[in-house]
Amino acid sequence: VYICYDRHFPDGARILGLNGAEIVYNPSATVAGLSQYLWKLEQPAHAAANGYFMGCINRVGQEKPWNLGKFYGSSYFVDPRGQIFAQASEDNDELLIADFDLDMIEEVRSTWQFFRDRRPETYGRLTEL
């Protein structure tokens, strides 16, 4: 499980993949604004880069009395190729159900070889900053 704000960081998404994750869920409570366009950009990229499915869940409506803004919903499932294959609306509480072809995980991982072709010896600076 990746939680809300975590989705902005590819390092954690990679660790989940390297540890064998096949399906990653990211529950979120995000309002419209700066990060909305990233909602359908970052998580499909994580799924494709790591060869796993993602369930990307965002709430809908407004939270009173705080009135932080409108939660934009748009929950979806994305496959290991980075393709969104089921999506909910922006405005309604919905139950989104989808079938996952788990064979696709190995197919994508063996085709793209992103884990094999990593060069962790060049990443040391990431942990020093």
Indicate where each model-derived feature is located.
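Cysteine/selenocysteine-centered motifs that mediate thiol-based redox chemistry or coordinate metal-sulfur cofactors
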Residues: 14-18, 105-129
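CN hydrolase (nitrilase-like) catalytic-core segments centered on the catalytic cysteine
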Residues: 4-95
